[in-house]
Amino acid sequence: MTGTAAPSQPRVRVGVQLQPQHAGYGQIRDAVLRAEDLGVDVIFNWDHFFPLYGDPDGRHFECWTMLGAWAEQTERVEIGALVTCNSYRNPELLADMARTVDHISGGRLILGIGAGWFQRDYDEYGYEFGTPGTRIADLAQAMPRIRARWAAMNPAPTRDIPVMIGGGGERKTLRIVAEHADVWHSFGDVETLRRKSGILDEHGAAVGRDTASLVTRSLGVDGQEPGEVGADLLAAGVGLVTLSTSGPDYDLGLVERWVRWRDAQG
């Protein structure tokens, strides 16, 4: 299903991660509909093969097959994974999958990607877990391969697919963010983001990218009310706030309050 991007974007955007666990797919599909109707800007899932919380053997669905369905179901929101594990797919294949979902959605895919961390996924699906260092090195090698594949594809992506990289390692991960990302998803509180944002900009200067203006800062705000932290987020330069919710109920009450706060910013 094609969609048309809005002519302008709000100062801060709101994303929700619908964790594909402990729910039937009908419940997930309904949550996507409700989230888009609420006015969120981005709907994410995640890229795991088992639940991360609750019953470790509970119901769960795969990331990219789901994104293809969301691309058809939705009309306005951007969609993506928060985040895809680089280890699970050859970079060229991942580029092709992303390009395909980009076309299905009419140019609304964000490629969220990270180095990977959840060992059970690796062990049960036959991937080599390695070490944090080897997984980060693999991510660094994958990013130019993904972009090179996009440049070679026929048809090309409908747009320059935005790349979101998740992680906060100050020496290696933030260097990869500086080199390749359009969005950086940080973990932790506002002060952590502010400090690491400065480090990111140092990496940006080293590689010749103005990351202060070219890389949107994203931060999770689970359990936090906009009236409590919203002003600090704006002061820190956050451009995307994300919230997460799990099945089977997919409670969007806090998400709705953040959408109202976003709209009040003008």
Set out the residue ranges of the language-model regions.
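Active-site-adjacent structural elements that line small-molecule/cofactor binding pockets in enzymes
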Residues: 1-266
